[in-house]
Amino acid sequence: NYLIQKEVTYIMNRDTLKQIMIDQKDIYLNNPLITRQYFLEANVNYCFVGIRRTGKSYMMYQQIKQLEADGIPLSQIIYVNFEDERLLEMTAEDLNLILEIGLEISETDIKPYLFLDEIQNINGWEKFVRRIADMKYRINITGSNSKMLSSEIASTLGGRFVIMNIYPYSFSEYLIANNMTKNYLDVISTKDRADVQNQYNKYVTYGAFPELVEIRNKRAFLNLSLIHISEPTRR
């Protein structure tokens, strides 16, 4: 009975994870992107770190879009966001299911590209990503808790990843996000100067979290963000 129950639990977990992976495709397929000004090399594993809401997930979406543009089928791209409440009970032992399901979906023996968002939510994740990197999978991860933000993360990952700190928008990125795409280094007209000054005033007043651009009540958003930022760094 114990073995039967264990097998049923395994199947249920596998089916749930597969559904989550399918559901989450919509997240990166339907999100508009502002190309960030970070240089990313091909065939390098990245660990994107930074406080919440700086756009770490969007760095992954940007990479996925580039892979798609390079002709990589979406079936060979695996994205999992571990903030999903359906993954609360997931353990490090379950992580290999991601590979199994990815290979099943791709219907090929070619190693899929892995994007694991906020993976620090899974205890023991470090050994999994090191093993997968050693197996020559292309894998990118994000994290925002105190351990991921500390200098320890490089040694934790054993030199297998390039650690990249992600920050809120630069002012030039902020202008692009606000549909101001002229070369404002050569601003001449009075109206252009006024437009840039207006955006700069908002930039220094409210900051440049990517999500903030579309928010009307920026102050309320920032107050909520401060709560979210402090929570993971205490863990």
Spans of features found by a protein language model:
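Pre-Walker A adenine-sensing motif
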Residues: 25-41
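Hydrophobic anchor at the beta1->P-loop junction of P-loop NTPases
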Residues: 48
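Interdomain hinge/linker elements that couple catalytic modules in large macromolecular machines
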Residues: 2-25, 176-230, 234-235
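Hydrophobic positions on the alpha1 helix immediately C-terminal to the Walker A/P-loop
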Residues: 59
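Structural recognition of the conserved hydrophobic beta-strand(s) that form the central parallel beta-sheet
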Residues: 138-144, 165
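Short regulatory helix/loop adjacent to the ATP-binding pocket of P-loop NTPases
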Residues: 147-162, 178
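Conserved lysine of the Walker
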Residues: 56
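Short glycine-rich substrate-engagement loop in P-loop NTPases that contacts/grips substrate
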Residues: 80-109
